[in-house]
Structure formats: structure tokens, C-alpha cells
Amino acid sequence: MDKAVQDGTATAPEVLATNVMVMVVPKGNPAEIQSVGDLPHSDHFVLCDPHVPCGDISSQIIDDKRLDVHPSSQERQVADVLGKVASGEADAGWVYSTDATAAGDDVEVIDIPGAEKFTNQIMGAVTAEASHPDQARAVLDILSGDFASTWRERGFTPTE
């Protein structure tokens, strides 16, 4: 979005919703992990690779909280982390709240303290050369207001 604003393609961007990292454990939580404090004792903890967005955010949280964690595996995408946890191959992993929501009963969710400081932002803006800027603005208004319950149902945090 920053590039679109810089080159004049979009104006007045706004955050519509955010997506926060959560910890997931397999259904039934066989390793009995209750918090991120339990992770140093797990030999099967997975994260995304630091070079992809989910891994970058995870690294920021780890650095911010000064956590002493050592993932047994670093995956290229959130779906791989989620798959390892849901299948029981991993004791725990960090994924976006939307992915945890989509997994349903296959996983259990544990909040990561401080994760809300490091989110993915879902942005919206009217393009500078929109053919129908008023209608485009109306869509953004719906997405930032009336759509809040739908954002929540899907695991996002809507902006208030």
C-alpha cells in the first residue's frame, strides 16, 4: 500500500482489519502446552521461516518478548505450520488467527501475549483514477463498519 500511495495510485489508505499471530496445538493438546513459556521444553515446535511474512512477524514477537525458543522446523508458509500441528507432527506452532479459525476443531488456540503489536494489516483505499470513487468509498465504508462481524467470524480483528 505504501508504494501505491507513493506513486499516486491510491489515496487515503485505511486499515480495515488486522490478523494476529496465535499459537495452535493439536486437538486435545497432548503435550499440555499452556503458554509460550512452555515452548523451550518442546522438541516439536514449528514456525514459519523468518524470510516469509509469518516468520518475520514471529521473529519480531520473539525478539520483543525476549523469548528463548528454538523451533524444530521453519516452514515456508502458514499452511505447512498448521498442517504439522493439526496432524500431531508438531506440539505447537504459530499461525495467523485466520488460519487457526479456518482449521476449526483440528487445533486449539492459545493467545501469544504481545502479538497484537505485530499484525498483518488488511488495507483498503480508493484508487486515484477510480471510475466511480463514491461507490468505491461506499464499499470501504461497508468493510470498515457493517462488515465487522464477518471479519471476526473469519478470525480477523476489525478496526473500530
Regions found by a protein language model. Give the residues of each.
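Exported/periplasmic ABC-transporter solute-binding proteins
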Residues: M1-D7, A12-E160
